[in-house]
């Protein structure tokens, strides 16, 4: 697992967490294509000029339908896609197996179960937090290198 900046067709950066298939327990094919790695957005995506990006300390995109999220992610260029159910579940099982189940923003900017864990809220966000602004306990692996915000927000 590593963090990597990957650029979309517009040349804009996304911060991604990159895994080998074996690290996630996933096959080496995705949508019928052979893959050496899975790149998963490190942060909840924000919208910039109507395009989703994985960047820290941004307002997360909200009120988007599943179909619209698929379209937006695929608009970034070849190979870009909305996280699949298999990828999401694999991250969850990884956290479970490694005893790092993430907490998150479940109580207006803080964790309900650990209120000392807080993120940065923003005006008009109704208790939502800026992407990546929470502590490492909000990441899938409990480190600064993990996928953020799998719980809450």
Predicted segments, located by residue:
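Short aromatic-cysteine micro-motif
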Residues: 26-150
